[in-house]
């Protein structure tokens, strides 16, 4: 991936140059309006991701996914890819916008890619998730949660933001395990029995 890594560096430099440039003055046709004046504040930092979206790749191998994510014509990417063996590939700086969510919505968020980190798990969409893979995922989630102060409820799946067109990660994904570790939510399995003399009319 020497050639694609070179393209990555070129694009990052181009975006950095764009961010560093002062905004261009926009001339107003209406002379009654004052032109904008740029005064750079000294109080700022980088915007942080606030969501983590978990996917399955729906492909046959990690290598196939890496190739897919490095072909310009596919227009799809993720920040991280985790192989069945547990090997973790970091493909994009966390502060940059990956193309992993597509059309979707969560609460009032309609541009999920702009506020999230995308994690792809090597899985054909039907098989169980390997323990080595899950261990790598949990380690990564722990780091991301601490580094960016991501709320527990904001670790969700692709199927959550696009339920009518996506179902990943598949039904075998251990959401309960993740919730127990502090990533995502799980329903309360403790149910209280209804008293025998319960009067539903009251």
Give the residues covered by each predicted segment.
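N-terminal pre-domains immediately preceding structured catalytic cores
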Residues: 20-46, 179-202
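Basic/polar, cationic surfaces and motifs that engage anionic cell-wall
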Residues: 12-15, 125-202
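Secretory-pathway/luminal and periplasmic proteins that interact with or process carbohydrate-rich
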Residues: 2-7, 89, 163-172
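Active-site-adjacent loop/helix surface patches within enzyme catalytic domains
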Residues: 24-45, 50-153
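Non-catalytic cell-wall polysaccharide-engagement segments
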Residues: 1-22
């Amino acid at each position: 991936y020497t050639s694609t890594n070179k393209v990555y560096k070129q694009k990052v430099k181009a975006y950095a140059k764009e961010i560093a440039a002062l905004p261009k003055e926009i001339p107003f046709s209406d002379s009654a309006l004052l032109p904008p004046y740029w005064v750079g504040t000294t109080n700022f930092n980088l915007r942080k991701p606030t969501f983590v979206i978990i996917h399955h790749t729906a492909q046959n191998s990690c290598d196939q996914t890496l190739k897919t994510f490095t072909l310009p014509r596919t227009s799809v990417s993720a920040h991280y890819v985790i192989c069945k063996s547990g090997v973790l590939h970091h493909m994009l700086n966390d502060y940059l916008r990956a193309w992993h969510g597509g059309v979707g919505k969560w609460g009032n968020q309609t541009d999920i890619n702009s506020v999230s980190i995308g994690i792809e798990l090597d899985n054909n969409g039907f098989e169980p998730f390997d323990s080595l893979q899950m261990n790598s995922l949990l380690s990564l989630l722990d780091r991301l949660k601490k580094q960016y102060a991501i709320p527990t409820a904001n670790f969700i799946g692709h199927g959550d933001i696009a339920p009518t067109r996506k179902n990943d990660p598949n039904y075998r994904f251990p959401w309960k395990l993740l919730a127990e570790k502090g990533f995502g939510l799980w329903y309360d399995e403790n149910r209280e029995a209804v008293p025998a003399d319960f009067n539903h009319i009251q």
